Amino acid sequence: VLSPADKSNVKAAWGKVGGHAGDYGAEALERMFLSFPTTKTYFPHFDLSHGSAQVKGHGKKVADALTNAVALVDDMPNALSALSDLHAHKLRVDPVNFKLLSHCLLVTLAAHHPADFTPAVHASLDKFLASVSTVLTSKYR
C-alpha cells in the first residue's frame, strides 16, 4: 500500500519525467530486451533494434499507462482495468515480465535523474511499480 509520502514522491518524480516519458519508456524496453532476452518472445513482429519506431511506440504506450496510473494512483484498478484484461486474456504475458520491466524503468529513471533518485524516491517508485504490476496481473486469477 502506498503511503501519502510514497504518492507524493511518485507524483514529484514522474512530474520531472515530463515530455521524456515516451523516450524513457522506450529506453526501459530496450534495456529489458538486452538484459532479459526471453522478453523478446512477446514481440516477434517488432523490429527490436535500437531506436526502432515500434519500440518507441510501445515505450510511449507504457509511459502513457504509467502517467495515467500516477494521475489516478488512488484508483489504479479502474485506471488499468483494460490493460489488465489485455495482458491477461489476449497477450498472455507472463507476470514476471512486469517485474523485469519495472526494474528497467527504475534503472532508466535513476540514470536520467540521479540527483532526484534518493533512497526514499527509489523505494516509493518501486512500491508504485509493484502496485501497477499487481493490478496488471490481478485478472490472471
Curated annotation (Swiss-Prot):
Give the matching CDD domains.
Answer: Hb-alpha-like
Kindly list the GO CC terms recorded for this protein. blood microparticle; haptoglobin-hemoglobin complex; hemoglobin complex
Pfam families given in the database record:
Globin
Residues recorded as bearing Phosphoserine in the entry: 3, 35, 49, 102, 124, 131, 138
Q: Where is the Globin domain?
A: 1-141
Q: Which InterPro entries does the UniProt entry name for this protein? A: Globin, Globin-like_sf, Globin/Proto, Hemoglobin_a-typ, Hemoglobin_oxygen_transport, Hemoglobin_pi
Which GO terms of the molecular function aspect are on file? haptoglobin binding; heme binding; iron ion binding; organic acid binding; oxygen binding; oxygen carrier activity; peroxidase activity
Q: Which GO terms describe its biological process?
A: hydrogen peroxide catabolic process
- Give residues where Phosphotyrosine occurs: 24
Q: Which residues form the signal peptide?
A: none
Q: Which PANTHER family match?
A: HEMOGLOBIN FAMILY MEMBER, HEMOGLOBIN SUBUNIT ALPHA
Q: What does this protein do?
A: Involved in oxygen transport from the lung to the various peripheral tissues.
Q: What is this protein called?
A: Hemoglobin subunit alpha
Q: What organism does the UniProt record list as the source?
A: Saguinus mystax (Moustached tamarin)
